[in-house]
Amino acid sequence: LEYNQDNLTDDMWGYNRYTKQEVRIASAFFQNEWKNKQWSFLLGGRLDKHNMVDHVIFSPRANLRYNPTENMNLRASYSFGFRAPQAFDEDLHIENVGGTVSMIELAKDLTEEKSQSLSISGDLYHRWGDFQGNLLIEGFYTSLSDVFALRQIGERDGIIINERYNEKGAKVYGLTLEGKIAYRSLLQLQAGVTMQKAEYKQARAWSDDETVPMEKKMFRTPNTYGYFTLSYNPFVPMTIALSGTYTGSMMVEHKAGFIDKDIAVNTPDFFELNLKAGYDFNLYKGITMQVNAGVHNIFNAYQSDFDRGAKRDSGYIYGPGMPRSYFAGVKLSF
């Protein structure tokens, strides 16, 4: 059994917006698992009563595992989830679009967003002398109904009002590959890539300009993204870490103001590479001091087309969070 309560008060006198929200969620969770060395089957569910939803929501889940060999795991899982029709952090943000402030309001008939997810995966392990490796292959499919979306419904006191409402549905599906290989305690490499497609079940209008084409694809969801981390310990106190993140091209909204007309922009892809080196000093009886330094975003992969001026679209931001930067630090461990 579980009970959560959250009280939110957010008053913006300058914009004449006052938010007072009380969220109460009473939940009960149950599950049972049957297993032996080769098989396992888990069946469970969760009951949630949210004070902003007029009915109890049942969220079932199931998981099946099969181990044909000691070094192979095969899994299939199903789960149901929901998101309540309440104000979240992003709904409280104020944006500047074309010199005009925009805010988000919840539609009066907003209902909960529901999701059903299915995944199938294979997990392989192997050892070759001093090397050991792991490979994960996973396919996934998620169907969303009554999905939350935004639409511009007009202006009030010079403020653009965007309404959060329920779209008919959306789906996200794809494939994830992840691998790890290690050589003793000297070297470890881990990498992964996800190829996916995320789209609404019907094309939707995202601009109040009727001449702007509707879009079926979800904004800010790249079809491909991935990462890698490489750690090297040449000797015990010294650690060198190289990491990278790849973000494929995605579609982003660009609102008029700095530009003449709303457009959907296909962004370039980005590869962000980071390097960090650290050295540990044993100071006294279990007290360790680490001195580290490195570089974030070595190749300076960064957005190059920011809007400027009073009429800029403050929401038109994508890609890595910072340009190339250098850092140094000291950490004490007790």
Each language-model region and where it sits:
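Gram-negative outer-membrane beta-barrel transporters
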Residues: 35-40, 139-143, 163-255
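Residues that define the transmembrane beta-barrel architecture of outer-membrane proteins
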Residues: 20-26, 35, 56-58, 114-118, ...
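Surface-exposed extracellular loop regions of Gram-negative outer-membrane beta-barrel proteins
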Residues: 1-4, 19-51, 55-61, 65, ...
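Membrane-embedded beta-barrel scaffold of Gram-negative outer-membrane proteins
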Residues: 67, 75, 109-165, 171-173, ...
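C-terminal beta-signal and adjacent terminal beta-strands/loops
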Residues: 247-255, 279-334
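Repeated loop/turn-to-beta-strand initiation elements of outer-membrane beta-barrel proteins
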Residues: 38-41, 71-74, 128-133, 185-189, ...
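Residue-level signature of outer-membrane beta-barrel architecture
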Residues: 32-36, 47, 66-67, 80, ...
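Transmembrane beta-barrel strands of outer-membrane/channel proteins
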Residues: 1-5, 43-47, 76-80, 89, ...
